Amino acid sequence: MNHPFRILPLLWHARRPSRIHNMIAVADTFWLRKGYEALTFFGFILVHSRQEAERINNRMDTLKNHETIHLRQAQSCGDSWLRFYWKYMVFWWKARKARRKIRNAGYLLNPFEMEAYAHMNDLHYLDRQPDGCATGWKRYAQMSLDERLILLKQKRH
């Protein structure tokens, strides 16, 4: 998919986060920007190519785990994609204040991304969570922006 309106069928078929058990990867070069490997979009994983979509659809790996964590975060936001995306955008907007200190601050200091990156290599992380929900983002959301920045810098070194 490379046209902006081709995303409409995905929206039409969107289901509540709790009703999705296996996210399907779909190739979309329009909505997925350079520098990003994948994007969770209303229960689908958008990737750059059909080959990558097939690879993700056929096995669980760290990238699919990262995106599945976002699915479970949406479940923890009242089982609503709209609440999840609203909170995501608010966190992103607030974290932009640190953009002079770190590139892509809105993304990297977003509590949802911090939880997903912290646990993406642990393929059993979600299995250990109550009800399979990912709520670690709430701990990051309670931190100040400076505390999140310090934590991010510690993890990078």
Residue ranges and their predicted role:
Residues 37-38, 45-65, 107-108:
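Short pre-active-site segment immediately N-terminal to the catalytic Zn-binding motif
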